[in-house]
């Protein structure tokens, strides 16, 4: 199961204790204070990276703790600082405080770092307390505890193109054709059970970097109310630059293809109104099942019902129309 949300308790390291110690040298039988300070506890840092795609490495982990600072030593030696603990998370990670639900940070780019829990300060050794009136202090202080925080990490995938559609609309087959990869396909609902990322080469611009495409698990009517795979995956649509609606042009037993498109649009609108303003292309898939005259007739019907939308007819299975779709990607994303 794709792990895109976790709750975890983070504990920074405790500061090391200061110590009471005395100089013990041959010609100084009553040497002065010589106890060192404790080391600083390790902090916990969260860092985003492009090579990480989920929270899989933190599965079943309830808490993480940075290293404690070490106690001071004689000869005025300070204890070693605790090592920082760095959590590497994917781009697109939202960090929330579990108690307040406040968004602490949005890791939208590669290499962003945040110190989420600071290590405790080290305690003071008795040397620190030496004064002109107190030449032999016997006082030392313990290290301070590190910060503790319970946080929620939620991933919203960042991609150029997000494929959305009903189960069995042919999304995974089209994804495989576009990204030249192999995602499991099958004639049953929810073949795609987790978001899958791929790269679509730009065929019209030689030095254009590939587009990142995300195959989002199939949406069903009521997804915004958490039906089917529901809200867990609708949120991944938010971070895409362009939506590719994939509709089976032949429809299915329960509804017409035109009705499928209307429901898809409504689901996204109900989930978040501003998704209606996101750029989109409508891919009328599986044209290999229709005769040329039937294709044109259905396209004209879609254009009549949805006059403001951009349509492309294609077949993810045979590859027909995919070059045209790639050209549309270039036109819409190279701005």
Curated annotation (Swiss-Prot):
Gene Ontology annotations for the cellular component aspect, listed alphabetically: cytoplasm
Annotated coiled-coil segments of the chain: none
EC number, UniProt record: 3.6.5.-
CDD domains: Obg
Source species, domain of life: Bacteria
Keywords on record: Cytoplasm, GTP-binding, Hydrolase, Magnesium, Metal-binding, Nucleotide-binding
MF terms in GO: GTP binding; GTPase activity; magnesium ion binding
Positions annotated to bind Mg(2+): 172, 192
Subcellular localization, as worded in the UniProt entry: Cytoplasm
Cofactor dependency: Mg(2+)
OBG-type G domain location: 159-334
SUPFAM superfamilies: Obg GTP-binding protein N-terminal domain (SSF82051), P-loop containing nucleoside triphosphate hydrolases (SSF52540)
Domain Obg: 1-158
BP GO terms, sorted: ribosome biogenesis
Pfam families, alphabetized: GTP1_OBG, MMR_HSR1
Chain sites annotated for binding GTP: 165-172, 190-194, 215-218, 285-288, 315-317
HAMAP family associated with the record: GTPase_Obg (MF_01454)
Quaternary context: Monomer.
Role summary: An essential GTPase which binds GTP, GDP and possibly (p)ppGpp with moderate affinity, with high nucleotide exchange rates and a fairly low GTP hydrolysis rate. Plays a role in control of the cell cycle, stress response, ribosome biogenesis and in those bacteria that undergo differentiation, in morphogenesis control.
Family: Belongs to the TRAFAC class OBG-HflX-like GTPase superfamily. OBG GTPase family.
Protein name: GTPase Obg
Source species: Chlamydia caviae (strain ATCC VR-813 / DSM 19441 / 03DC25 / GPIC) (Chlamydophila caviae)
Lineage of origin: Bacteria, Pseudomonadati, Chlamydiota, Chlamydiia, Chlamydiales
């Amino acid at each position: 199961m794709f792990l895109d949300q976790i709750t975890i308790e983070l504990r920074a390291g405790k500061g090391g204790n200061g110590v009471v110690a005395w100089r013990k040298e041959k010609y100084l039988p009553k040497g002065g204070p010589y106890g060192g300070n404790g080391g600083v506890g390790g902090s916990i840092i969260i860092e985003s990276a492009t090579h990480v795609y989920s929270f899989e490495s933190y599965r079943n982990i309830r808490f993480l703790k940075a290293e404690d600072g070490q106690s001071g030593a004689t000869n005025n030696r300070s204890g070693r600082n605790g090592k920082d603990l760095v959590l590497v998370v994917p781009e697109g990670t939202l960090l929330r405080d579990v108690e307040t639900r406040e968004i602490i940070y949005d890791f939208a780019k590669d290499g962003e770092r945040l110190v989420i829990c600071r290590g405790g300060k080290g305690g003071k050794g008795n040397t620190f307390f030496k004064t002109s009136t107190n030449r032999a202090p016997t006082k030392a202080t313990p290290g301070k505890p590190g910060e503790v925080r319970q946080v929620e990490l939620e991933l919203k995938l960042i991609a150029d193109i997000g494929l959305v559609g009903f189960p069995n609309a042919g999304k995974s087959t089209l994804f495989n054709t576009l990204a030249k990869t192999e995602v499991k396909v099958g004639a049953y609902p929810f073949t795609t059970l987790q978001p899958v990322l791929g790269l679509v080469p730009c065929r019209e611009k030689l030095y254009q970097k590939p587009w990142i495409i995300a195959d989002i698990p199939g949406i069903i009517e009521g997804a915004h109310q958490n039906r089917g795979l529901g809200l867990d995956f609708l949120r991944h649509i938010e971070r895409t630059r362009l939506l590719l609606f994939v509709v089976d042009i032949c429809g299915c037993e329960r509804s017409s293809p035109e009705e499928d498109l209307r429901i898809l649009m409504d689901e996204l609108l109900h989930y978040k109104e501003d998704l209606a303003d996101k750029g989109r292309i409508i891919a009328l898939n599986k044209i290999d099942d229709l005769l040329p005259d039937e294709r044109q007739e259905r396209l004209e019907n879609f254009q009549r019902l949805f006059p403001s939308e951009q349509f492309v007819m294609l077949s993810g299975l045979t590859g027909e129309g995919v070059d045209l779709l790639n050209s549309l990607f270039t036109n819409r994303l190279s701005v």
